[in-house]
């Protein structure tokens, strides 16, 4: 095998690979063995005609397609490895020379991993990130707990007031016609919750059980449905029942009922501690992101479009999987969000480019700093992932993961080590 490499443009190379005639003839014979049964030649049982007869009857090129595939599968990986070429996509294969008794020559044009020119990555200055737990946030959490533990009972007499829960039947009309999704029966709505559009809920205040009313509202301009965006609507509403919500008193007894604590002050203290931890983790994540962005701003890199497109495809697949867990599919998602595949992909583009750039920079730093994943770290990471699957035999699952996903585990471990290096060497400024 002989290989010539030509740089035809930035991050794109063309390899001219020559396979000697003897090797190509072996590939033709292999192709014959694979396809012999499909050839039907007069005077021979189907699949029993010898190679030379097949060539005469069908022409020498009849076996070339598979022979080409066999040769490329064997020689292309060797060619890129020997020339230290790291492709990011499948190659474009073109045949230059092919024929009986001739060397087989083909070209493989491929986009390669771009070169990364690192700037300053140690000691980058990043603004300090910190959050304080506000008393209001603690009070809001207590109110939320209070709401969840409220006692709800029927309001036998009287009108709807703010804070009441109304059980309603409704049917909506736009331009005088009923619209899809605009009708429901025995629907519960808390007055003042802002669940419905406009002042729909406010217009129910003062109504009694079994009373009906026409409610007039307008849909927001960006409601998410082209047939409803910005349009006025009329709803026929009937009050089926009214419920009143009684909130429990915020006292020590409440704390005992909803938690492991004996006093309200202990419960408040616990809520504050949990919020501090959450905000500390949030600040840490934001600081790490800022460090990576600062390092990225110092680096020079021209990312091939194909890498961004591949990352977008990965993001779409991830979205599809998340939707599947919710019992949805992409088509339903596009309809619900008034979007399309093209719009979603375009929305993802900036994030995809950022991810690819970050990965390339992290890999380059790992190379410069000689950061690698050890076998012990791989085992630990595989075990960590295996535990998330909830299988009985965690060790066996971890072993399978370590073998099947080794490359992904290595990247995850190495990127984590690089991030630690960048953060530890960074300078926090006010």
Swiss-Prot record:
One of its GO terms (molecular function) is ribosome binding. One of its GO terms (cellular component) is cytoplasm. Residues 163-248 form the PPIase FKBP-type domain. SUPFAM superfamilies: FKBP-like, Triger factor/SurA peptide-binding domain-like, Trigger factor ribosome-binding domain. Its EC number is 5.2.1.8. The keyword Isomerase applies. Keywords: Cell cycle, Cell division, Chaperone, Cytoplasm, Isomerase, Rotamase. It is found in: Cytoplasm. Coiled coil: none annotated. InterPro entries: PPIase_dom_sf, PPIase_FKBP_dom, Trig_fac, Trigger_fac_C, Trigger_fac_C_sf, Trigger_fac_ribosome-bd_bac, Trigger_fac_ribosome-bd_sf, Trigger_fact/SurA_dom_sf. It catalyses: [protein]-peptidylproline (omega=180) = [protein]-peptidylproline (omega=0). GO terms for biological process: 'de novo' cotranslational protein folding; cell division; chaperone-mediated protein folding; protein transport; protein unfolding. It comes from the Bacteria. HAMAP family: Trigger_factor_Tig. Belongs to the FKBP-type PPIase family. Tig subfamily. Consists of 3 domains; the N-terminus binds the ribosome, the middle domain has PPIase activity, while the C-terminus has intrinsic chaperone activity on its own. Involved in protein export. Acts as a chaperone by maintaining the newly synthesized protein in an open conformation. Functions as a peptidyl-prolyl cis-trans isomerase. This is Trigger factor. The lineage of its organism: Bacteria, Bacillati, Bacillota, Clostridia, Eubacteriales.
